[in-house]
Amino acid sequence: MTLKLYDDAAGTSEVGASLVITHETDLSDNPQDFQLWYAEVDEDTGDNGIFTYEASSNPGVDQISISIGDTTPGSGHEAAEITLGLTAGDLATNTAGAALDIGTSFLSGASNAETFYMRVENAVTTVSNSLELSLAGNALLKSSTP
């Protein structure tokens, strides 16, 4: 199963291992907002919704979620610098650093991609390359769509 993050709705531009964000050291460019799509397009090239994805913990009941990981808490950037939302408006009210629930199931294919928004509010004023923050989905169960 190849669920990936994309920066386009068609699922043609994969985010890859890292999202490059440049910040000013005086923080004058805060915040920076992005729209991303979570999808499986490699195995459903016909965009037919042939697979259904559900949380493996309790399929069809538990939420599929996207969480923010921090490999070095207390050092460099913190998960609290990122806010996730289902809409751009949610970025102003959702809790920074919190996981985002996107539903109990979704279908494969680009047209079924789950879109969400991410706000990055830099709090680090030193010049550096930081790779300690990540986005990840919970474990999913894939089944053929009836």
Regions found by a protein language model. Name each.
Residues 2-45, 49-56:
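Beta-sheet-dominated interaction scaffolds and their linkers
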Residues 3-5, 36-38, 64-68, 118, ...:
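Hydrophobic beta-strand residues in large extracellular and virion-surface proteins
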Residues 6, 42-114:
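Surface-exposed binding patches on compact interaction domains or structured appendages
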Residues 15-17, 27-35, 112-116, 125-135:
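Short, solvent-exposed loop/turn segments enriched in Ser/Thr/Gly
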Residues 15-23, 98-104, 119-120:
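Short structured motifs
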Residues 21, 52-53, 102, 133-137, ...:
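Generic detector of low-complexity/intrinsically disordered segments
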Residues 40-42, 120-124, 137-143:
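Beta-strand elements of well-folded, non-transmembrane domains
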